[in-house]
């Protein structure tokens, strides 16, 4: 089954709606972003999700912050995983206590072979195998841009390594993306928003269409 992550949650109600869909990961942002929340709000979300069974794993999103700060916030907010969306080195990743989701930014002109080489370098350097997340490279943002990249890159990389993918995905294009790219996981933020706010109806529709496409594809 394709793993799903709804990212950039800012309210408890959004997190509970995400949990009801059966999403695997719920993301809260601590990096500079319009979706950034306080540690107090993140802890409130963690407490709301805690009694649910099953529940999505709570992921904190960081970018170019110190490892000490990441570990402190992860502990205070009772996170399950840490997503590193900046330019963090593999050595830095080894300093993070929780399991890591490491973003690989796919810029214009990047080839599948270059992405594969970066994944191989990470697997060689890291003490624990992370989840690799491919996302669109933009100058201004570390994610949540709503911009996509060449899906053929994902298709080629997925033949060798399981990867999660973000960038420009939404309920309208997700089934076509899955058919082409066959990813291990999918991450969405702006694609399930209306006027910059998480839309619970779009979250439900997105997950429903992922499950439908995943169930109908031939592996």
UniProtKB/Swiss-Prot annotation:
Its EC number is: 5.3.1.24
This protein's pathway reads:
Amino-acid biosynthesis; L-tryptophan biosynthesis; L-tryptophan from chorismate: step 3/5
Question: Can you state which reaction this protein catalyses?
Answer: N-(5-phospho-beta-D-ribosyl)anthranilate = 1-(2-carboxyphenylamino)-1-deoxy-D-ribulose 5-phosphate
* Single biological process term from Gene Ontology: L-tryptophan biosynthetic process
Any idea which GO molecular function terms this record carries? phosphoribosylanthranilate isomerase activity
Q: What cystine linkages occur within this chain? A: none
Keywords in UniProt for this one? Amino-acid biosynthesis, Aromatic amino acid biosynthesis, Isomerase, Tryptophan biosynthesis
Question: Member of which family?
Answer: Belongs to the TrpF family.
Give the protein's recorded name. Answer: N-(5'-phosphoribosyl)anthranilate isomerase
Q: Which organism is the protein's source?
A: Dehalococcoides mccartyi (strain ATCC BAA-2266 / KCTC 15142 / 195) (Dehalococcoides ethenogenes (strain 195))
Its taxonomic path starts at:
Bacteria, Bacillati, Chloroflexota, Dehalococcoidia, Dehalococcoidales
